[in-house]
């Protein structure tokens, strides 16, 4: 949807500058823990500062700017038929569904059950017919297939039931390789897929300030094969991040910038989205509250942070604390989507 709403800016220019400077200071003085010796070696060769004793990588400001500048500010998430291509970085807000749930409300029984492969097909079919949803994020984990073939089956069924772009969360290297082989077969070859990739991958660093070797290898494989990726930190205020919203944003921004920069070190020019999935913890009851208003505020702020660097952003909205599709659900989903959309996010997932 083109932006036709007055902008919502939770951060003043002064606040925006302060958070960005603090995040860069975190990367320069504290650093990111990299759990993989080969990637420590790669980053050292690229000029990053390495502390082998605690596997920390620190980034000087000039070094960071050099590699952030290599990330494209615009690219396309292609559909298979060319009718629903998603152009990122052009000032248009796109919505996508949420992904990788493990339980679903069964409309036949009214109760919850584990998700199955048929649910991937059903949700992909639904998204294929929804004009307001620009692409399909693999919605659930199929529990009726062998774990070794989760990603292969998920992507196969998704691509079978929608012609829109398919994005999926991948958490193991073998699964990414299987998905890549499948997509190349469908595209007609490696170069055909590289030219117009109709699949993309979501990966997540570990908050606080850690990226494991598995995630780094996934980012490298995708980047080197032209597959768009997002390295989306998901810090939780009061749990895996500071209790203040500003503190959480500083940490999230540092993690997101590190993800973009490291991806460019491993795969120069890789199509990478600045990712943001910040949320909160109800510290009275130790409950994860993704549907809180603070979550929407932080995601709107994340858009401002991404646009400081002219990066397309994968943000979050459309979430709720309701347990049923009721008026609470509708209200919370509407306003979290609206707050992030009014700041011009390129892609809002969980919508």
Regions found by a protein language model. Name each.
Residues 1-193, 197-213, 346:
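Metallocofactor- and cofactor-centric catalytic cores in central/energy metabolism, strongly enriched
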Residues 114-346:
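Helix-rich catalytic cores of soluble enzyme domains
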Residues 348-351:
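Short acidic/histidine-rich active-site segments
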